């Protein structure tokens, strides 16, 4: 332990001697300004330090002494970095035209102005700069819009109702125009009676009539000729009503009508002739 203390004392003495020697050298250089010592590092752009002082009136540090060093005294030469003599240039403004489509406040109104009188039915509303809402708006235009909320917030998946109540939803009420094709048509007059549950038979009858008419339109003249040829065969067993319905189904030229009339006579005769003949002839027994 004693050896360590002796070493510490020796180091302190050496440090004190070094500082003492350095102070003496600085004093000698100040006394003899002619002789200068060249240092290895060049100190460029550093002002000469004349004195150092402490600032004791600093409220930020509770008036503790704050070291402050003054730089080299004298006027510093700097370039003119701010132009004092030049005047500011006028700001460019775009040309203003009172006859533009956006501004019509300086133009004369097309209709004569009338002072607005409250609850006056005889006078017309005044035509000014501010657009006035015309009271005679039709109800059809108002019904062409649907009102809804623009955006909905406060969605919480952890709660049992995920979305908030209707009255507590955040957003603005916006109107959306209804397209003419998207609106459902309301039945009028007889359509209301036909749409009732008791009018199913009438609907079915209309559907069958429409189906029959569509089928009759779709029949081609080639099919009509095939039907007439089938009727001319002697082995067909058709009645007069069936033949007449087939003739009505395929209207054609008067020549074809004559042919069909002759075919009906032959088919009727064949049908009467076949009625007397038995359908199944008796089988002869071999003796």
Curated annotation (Swiss-Prot):
Keywords: Cell projection
Superkingdom, taxonomy of origin: Eukaryota
Localization, UniProt: Cell projection, Cilium
Source species of the chain: Homo sapiens
GO cellular component: cilium
Region entry Mn 1, spans: 128-160
Region (Mn 2): 213-246
InterPro entries hit by this protein: CMIP6
Pfam families: CMIP6 (PF15667)
Disulfide bridge map: none
Name of the protein in question: Ciliary microtubule inner protein 6
Phylogenetic lineage: Eukaryota, Metazoa, Chordata, Craniata, Vertebrata
Amino acid composition bias (Basic and acidic residues), ranges on this chain: 1-15, 25-34, 203-212, 232-245
Disordered: annotated segments: 1-42, 179-287
